């Protein structure tokens, strides 16, 4: 697990997520190595590259991000054949016009999500709670390193894509 820190400090929300993840890992008998990285895009990229060589799976949690138990459990599922899972997060602020529009139209969207914009766009559904991602700036994600390395070798690309680097 790679956790982003600022001024050598971890957000309380993020720390709570890490503690919950450790409890779930202990219950399942799974090892979980936690490393901290400064909130610098170059350092994050280097940390990810280094751990791709040694870890089966990387779980990346940006500063201030909180993962609920269901998300943590998704991180620990096998997800055979999947390279990465991203966990959409809410962008700051409420779009009250969008909220009003949803209420007036009788939207089936959960009321607690109306008027919110997310950092990830999805397309077709793959399975329960799993969708193809069309665009993302996710601040929490999971990578099956072997699948990603295999895909990189097919494309003869040994480094992380510049697109990913720009988003960090």
Where are these regions (language model features)?
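N-terminal anchoring/stem segment of glycosyltransferases
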Residues: 1-54
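Conserved beta-strand segments of the P-loop GTPase G domain that flank and frequently precede/overlap
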Residues: 3-5, 62, 86-87
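Residue-level marker for beta-strand->alpha-helix junctions and adjacent short loops that shape enzyme
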Residues: 7-9, 65-66, 91-92
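Acidic donor-binding loop at a coil-to-helix junction in glycosyltransferase catalytic cores
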Residues: 158-166
């Amino acid at each position: 697990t790679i956790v982003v820190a600022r001024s050598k400090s971890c957000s309380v929300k993020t720390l709570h997520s890490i503690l919950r993840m450790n409890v779930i890992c202990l219950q399942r008998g799974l090892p979980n190595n936690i490393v901290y990285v400064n909130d610098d895009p170059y350092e994050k990229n280097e940390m990810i590259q280094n751990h791709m060589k040694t870890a089966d799976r990387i779980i990346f949690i940006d500063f201030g991000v909180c993962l609920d138990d269901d998300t943590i459990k998704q991180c620990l599922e096998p997800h055979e054949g999947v390279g990465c899972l991203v966990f959409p997060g809410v962008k700051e602020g409420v779009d009250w016009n969008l909220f009003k529009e949803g209420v007036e139209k009788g939207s089936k969207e959960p009321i607690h999500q109306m008027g919110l914009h997310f950092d990830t766009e999805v397309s077709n559904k793959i399975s329960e709670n799993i969708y193809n991602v069309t665009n993302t700036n996710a601040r929490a994600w999971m990578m099956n390193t072997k699948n990603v390395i295999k895909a990189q070798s097919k494309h003869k690309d040994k480094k992380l894509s510049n697109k990913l680097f720009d988003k960090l």
